[in-house]
Amino acid sequence: MTQTPTNPRERLIVALDVPDVAQASKLVATLDDSVLFYKIGYQLAYAGGLSMAQDLIGAGKKVFIDLKLHDIGNTVASGVASIAKLGATFLTVHAYPQTMKAAVEASRGTGLKILAVTVLTSYDEADLKEAGYSLGVADLVAQRARQAQAIGIDGLVCSAEEAANLRAIVGEGLSLVTPGIRPAGSAVGDQKRVMTPARAIAAGADYLVVGRPIVAATDPKSAANAIVAEIAVAH
């Protein structure tokens, strides 16, 4: 069974969605001890971000590598093994059975936790229909969540809109990691299924991934602290 961190600051994951290590390092220095957990995605990973991940881990931070792996089993397993050596806490894979099975098996005994991406938070019903899916967002997310749990995945990446339903489906056995978090008054951007921090926690999210509302803020540290404060009082 997974355990939700008792320290609200450990439940905030800041997405380092910047183009290079120099900007990311500057942001991390600005945020200082207000943030303990960072996410590194495609943009930064391919610009030196994986080396930076090692530095962050060495400095006592936690790192979530968001590469959404999806390939043949051997290739996924090799990628998982490489990421595990970095000392990362989380790694994402797409929620396809063969991909999840390979990732879970490769992560055994490493300390790396595998998160399955159910449906991207930038997708809505129309997007799924255009891509050829017959199921709607809620049904597809539920189907993939059940498959992920049966395979032994550690957690799910889902929008806050699906969190309550997923918690009912998977119980307390999986961590729910929720992107698309926007404090009241923030721009939605390219996300289509968004929610405030307090509402996301109330819906059952264990971790909140926040990018632009902190990264693009005039005062990133104050923005991060405000979200942590909101997490602390949410129920």
UniProtKB/Swiss-Prot annotation:
Binding site for substrate: 17, 39, 66-75, 121, 182, 191, 211-212
Enzyme class, first EC level, given as a word: lyase
Entry annotated with the keyword Lyase: yes
Pfam families named in the record: OMPdecase
Keyword Lyase appears in the UniProt entry: yes
Keywords carried by this UniProt record: Decarboxylase, Lyase, Pyrimidine biosynthesis
Top-level division of the source organism's lineage: Bacteria
Reaction catalysed by this enzyme: orotidine 5'-phosphate + H(+) = UMP + CO2
GO cellular component: cytosol
E.C. numbers: 4.1.1.23
SMART domains per record: OMPdecase
InterPro entries membership: Aldolase_TIM, OMPdecase, OMPdecase_AS, OMPdecase_bac, OMPdeCOase_dom, RibuloseP-bd_barrel
Catalytic site positions: K68
Any one GO molecular-function label of the UniProt entry: orotidine-5'-phosphate decarboxylase activity
Family: Belongs to the OMP decarboxylase family. Type 1 subfamily.
Assembly: Homodimer.
Biological role: Catalyzes the decarboxylation of orotidine 5'-monophosphate (OMP) to uridine 5'-monophosphate (UMP).
Name of the protein this chain belongs to: Orotidine 5'-phosphate decarboxylase
Organism: Afipia carboxidovorans (strain ATCC 49405 / DSM 1227 / KCTC 32145 / OM5) (Oligotropha carboxidovorans)
Gene: pyrF
